[in-house]
């Protein structure tokens, strides 16, 4: 996710890290959405979001050796069985959307109208959605005020690569 520095007030960051740029909060969220990184209750709704579907194991956010946390048995069993059908993924729209035009939890559909997942959050032309992995290479869309809005999903580069057989 980049660098986070604590420096003395007035420090010249381009001297500390040559070629670096200082971003604002919108830059941070765009970068986060491009990488498929969830943050907070909008991306991880309490009582709804599951740790493995939210890629927390990929980010070392789950311990499979520590016990005694709520959902630990289900999480460990699912991880070791290897069947995770949905994951949070970065999505991109063909054009930037008006701010707050997509309701949280809006259903994402395949071209044939079958449910592919749910939109979690986004801004401009980027977002994050919980999608069925079987549908990520298909054309996807959202219905917004009666209009079909097309979007594409992608697998982030930082995800572990599947083992070759």
Q: How should each PLM-predicted stretch be described?
A:
Residues 11-12, 37-40, 81-83, 97-98:
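Short, catalytically relevant binding-site loops at active-site mouths
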Residues 35-48, 159-165:
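Short, low-order "capping/linker" segments at domain edges
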